Amino acid sequence: METIQAIRSRRSVRKYQQRLVPHEVIEQIVADAAYAPSWKNTQIARYVLVEDRTTIDKMAEEMVLDFKLNEKRLKNCPAVMVLTYVTGRSGYERDGSFSTPKEAGFEMFDAGIAAQTFCLAAWERGVGTVITGYFDEEKITRLLNLPENQKVGCVIGLCSPDEEPAAPKRKSVEDLLTYK
């Protein structure tokens, strides 16, 4: 698949086949996602694969902050990838001071780049994804026993797509681009 084709064809997949993605495919996707750019090559993204049905159901029922649509999507998903990021590195100098006025905001920026790279690599391999950003971070952190220096960036549903969603309408270049 060519890069532009992947960018233009990748969709959030919300209808899944109930089969797990093989671990070797997941490992290939993570290996590709490791090439996502990051602040000073800090590579702060980490990946936690959750396949245990009880854990996924608990995440869906208790950790999507009463957003029923996400609860339903997560409950139906055969596996989820929790993308976390190591804190205190991206946007920081070695002495702990900030390198930029954006301060710790670069952590989520780098996590977002990693999430997009992960999703494009998954799509290349026929794996559907849907990114969820609305969740109870503290509960997920406790449930998955994440290290103290990691925060949850997003939760990504992983699946074999049951159908290929139609492309939503996109804004025109004229709406998006300004020349000065």
Segments from the language model and where they lie:
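C-terminal helix-cap and adjacent tail motif
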Residues: 3-12, 25, 89, 154-180
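Glycine/small-residue-rich phosphate/adenosyl-binding loop
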Residues: 41-111
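Small-aliphatic-rich amphipathic alpha-helix that forms the alpha element of a beta-alpha
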Residues: 33, 81, 87, 96-143
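A glycine-rich helix N-cap at a beta->alpha junction
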Residues: 70-77, 145-167
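Short beta-strand segments
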Residues: 31-32, 36-37, 43-48, 117
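A short N-terminal beta-strand-loop micro-motif at the entrance of redox/enzyme domains
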Residues: 13-28
